Design a protein with these regions (language model features):
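Structured loop/turn residues at beta-strand edges in well-structured enzyme cores
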Residues: 18-21, 50-53, 84, 108, ...
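N-terminal binding-site loop/beta-alpha segment at the start of enzyme catalytic domains
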Residues: 1-23, 53, 76, 143-146
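Beta/alpha (TIM)-barrel catalytic core signal, keyed to glycine-rich beta->alpha loops juxtaposed to Asp/Glu
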Residues: 63-189
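Acidic-and-aromatic substrate-binding clefts and catalytic sites of carbohydrate-active enzymes
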Residues: 1-8, 32-37, 65-68, 117-123
Length: 189
């Protein structure tokens, strides 16, 4: 919702010859929409904007410092799942201690933790922890994000695809740096 792309995505799906059932559709609960009632209202808004009655994956965009509020939000996520408004639910940018809070709570575990993940940010501890609990890791920046300060005018160019080691490997195998990074992801699980 925060990216402002739901209307365009919905229009694209509606105008496409591809059936909705053949599209895996993910959207996110924005930070301002945490809490039980707000989360329930937010998914309904997203579904209306997307022009669909369900998403395949609904994600909490960012963990909250307030554990009680996070638990109320997760209660809403479970209801969204139970009501069929999402076929699976997950989180973004959660570290092991955030995931542990949901594990300790009991109930439905996140199907996915979507995080920045690439050869320069390998997230080994998180990947191991999530794997032990059956939580899939999905990269929101598989070819490398910006370096340094992240988003906006202070961000720096992607350094993964211009990494000399990745370039050397790409040259050795006659592939592009992007193909090498994708192969790394596949081999890393």
């Amino acid at each position: 919702a925060a990216y402002g792309n739901e209307a365009g995505v919905g229009e694209g799906i509606a105008s496409s010859p591809v059936l909705r059932a053949d599209v895996f559709l993910t959207t996110k609960l924005w930070n301002a929409d945490h809490g039980y009632e707000r989360a329930l209202a937010a998914v309904d808004t997203s579904l209306r904007t997307l022009g669909t009655d369900y998403v395949d994956l609904y994600l909490i965009h960012w963990p909250l410092q307030d554990r009680d509020q996070l638990m109320r939000t997760w209660d809403a996520m479970e209801k969204i799942l139970a009501d069929g408004k999402a076929h699976s639910i997950g989180v973004c940018n959660f570290e092991p201690h955030h995931l542990q809070a949901l594990i300790d709570r009991g109930g439905v575990l996140p199907a996915v933790d979507q995080v920045e993940l690439h050869p320069h940010l390998q997230q080994r501890e998180l990947r191991e922890f999530a794997g032990e609990h059956g939580i899939a890791i999905e990269s929101w920046s598989p070819l490398g994000g910006t370096s340094g300060s992240g988003w906006g005018p202070n961000s720096k160019p992607n350094t993964v695809l211009s990494d000399p080691t990745i370039g050397d490997i790409a040259a050795k195998y006659g592939r592009s740096p992007a193909q090498i990074v994708i192969a790394w992801h596949i081999r890393s699980g």
